[in-house]
């Protein structure tokens, strides 16, 4: 298969093409495909035009009824949720551990450990640089079925350097499972399923289902959660981490996630862009932060309902168990979450 190009229909002042150099290099992929989909399968080149479409549609604009519009911003203040963070903090250790860089590296295995060992050697040799926090953006080589997905937006991957991951990860990685347990204690039941195997998840779901006489399950799906994570949402999330670690370096590393600078070096040119907010794929706290924000938001809605409920979370996908007769109490969730910048679909 040969890679495809993209038609760019949007622009943004924070995206700048630094220059187009060289010739377009067509990506090639080899795959075994069934006859009925062969002519409809395609994937995108790692080119400037594809990157421009991906950046505009995945960072700055969302598709509305009348075309593309800016991504919604929060209309409610996240300070309204601070009391929940305070309650959550009580369920955390007084001072969560901070790993050494060596302990962080040793927590990985295989090729990832080798990559972090090389990054640690770099840090010891030249120290941490601001450029380590820049996003190094490329297009995911993902196959699409053109029959079921008409003109899909390319997916972008936005990692920072392994050196940055080590610097911030010594704080975040040992904290992650402690936060998940604290969320369970806040809710008074097992909520965060992210670390559970399939058997444990099934056991939890079956247990909650059996608690209700006429059970109903409502799935909550956040539309492009990472894109809708505003600067305000990140500040709220980061404030929780900073309650436990007041290290100025840690605060500075988190700030780099809120005021982001990215570069996309494509085969036919390069792009520089800036964006406030938005979750970057590959950040050490992507899973942790998404769980934290979604759990706090949903807890804020559920805590005062005059009915029995159970909540489960697996990142930005989550669900609620209630009695069928109480389903109407959940109808306000989309409006509630949208006030904090998140577009939700109820299933």
Residue ranges and their predicted role:
Residues 1-347:
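Viral RNA-dependent RNA polymerase
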């Amino acid at each position: 298969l040969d890679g495809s190009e993209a038609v760019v229909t949007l622009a943004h002042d924070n995206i700048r093409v630094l220059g187009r150099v060289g010739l377009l290099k067509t990506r090639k992929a080899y795959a075994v495909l069934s006859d009925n989909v062969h002519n409809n399968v395609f994937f995108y080149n790692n080119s400037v035009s594809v990157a421009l479409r991906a950046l505009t549609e995945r960072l700055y604009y969302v598709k509305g009824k009348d075309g593309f519009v800016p991504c919604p911003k929060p209309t409610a203040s996240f300070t309204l949720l601070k009391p929940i963070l305070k309650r959550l903090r009580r369920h955390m250790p007084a001072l969560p551990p901070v790993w050494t860089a060596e302990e962080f590296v040793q927590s990985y295995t295989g090729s990832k450990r080798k990559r972090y060992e090389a990054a640690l050697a770099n840090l010891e040799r030249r120290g941490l640089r601001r450029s380590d926090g820049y996003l190094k953006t490329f297009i995911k080589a993902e196959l699409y079925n053109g029959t079921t997905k008409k003109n899909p937006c390319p997916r972008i991957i936005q990692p920072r350097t392994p050196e940055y991951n080590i610097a911030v990860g010594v704080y975040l990685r040992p904290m992650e499972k402690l936060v998940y347990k604290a969320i369970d204690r806040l809710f008074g039941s097992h909520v965060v399923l992210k670390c559970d195997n399939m058997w444990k998840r099934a056991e939890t779901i079956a247990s909650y289902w059996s608690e209700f006489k006429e059970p109903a399950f409502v799935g909550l799906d956040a539309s492009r959660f990472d894109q809708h994570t505003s600067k305000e949402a990140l500040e709220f999330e980061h404030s929780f981490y900073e309650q436990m670690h007041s290290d100025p370096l840690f605060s500075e590393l988190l700030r780099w996630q809120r005021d982001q600078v990215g570069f996309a070096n494509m085969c036919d040119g390069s792009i520089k862009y800036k964006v406030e907010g938005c979750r970057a794929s590959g950040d050490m706290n992507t899973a942790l932060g998404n769980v934290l924000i979604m759990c706090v938001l949903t807890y804020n809605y559920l805590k005062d309902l005059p009915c029995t409920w159970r909540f489960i979370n697996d990142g930005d996908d989550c669900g609620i168990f209630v009695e069928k007769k109480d389903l109407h109490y959940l109808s306000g969730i989309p409006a509630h979450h949208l006030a904090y910048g998140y577009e939700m679909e109820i299933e």
